[in-house]
A protein has these predicted regions:
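A composition-biased, non-transmembrane "mature-region" signal
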Residues: 1-139
Length: 139
């Protein structure tokens, strides 16, 4: 962020079309030239493990939990009509949903299970502290 001067490093997650900046008291979301900000007390983060069919190279930190076929017949086996029907790994990925009552709705997926669990918990703790503070204290 070129216009911000801080005395701490600002953690940032850059995605294809948006950036998350985790400021000390709020999340700043940048999409193009548009910014949105939300206090952590107004941010909900939920996470769970999901099964993801990986059609490309499996990341080194991913856990393969099963396999399937690119083309499946009605019994769940390989569809023999396709000669390029290769087996695909099913990986256990973590999916995190960030929402707020101000309109933020973003979904992040990590190939490493639980990769953001501790960080999400930390942000929730900050939000809990903000909820206990008076409004004037966090402005």
């Amino acid at each position: 962020l070129p216009h911000f001067i801080t005395n701490v490093a600002i953690p940032c997650v850059k995605l294809s079309n948006l950036d998350f900046y985790f400021l000390p008291e709020r999340l700043l979301v940048k999409r193009g030239n548009t910014f949105a900000a939300v206090f952590y007390k107004n941010l909900q983060i939920s996470g769970f493990t999901t099964r993801f069919i990986e059609d490309e190279r499996v990341p080194g930190d991913a856990k393969v939990v099963d396999h399937t076929w690119r083309y499946v017949n009605k019994h769940g086996g390989p569809d023999r009509r396709f000669n390029n029907n290769r087996q695909l790994p099913i990986c256990a990925y973590s999916e995190y949903t960030l929402t707020s009552d101000t309109g933020i709705y973003e979904v992040l997926m990590t190939s490493k299970q639980g990769a953001m669990d501790a960080f999400a918990g930390f942000l929730c703790q900050i939000g809990n502290l903000q909820s206990q503070m008076k409004l004037a204290d966090i402005r």
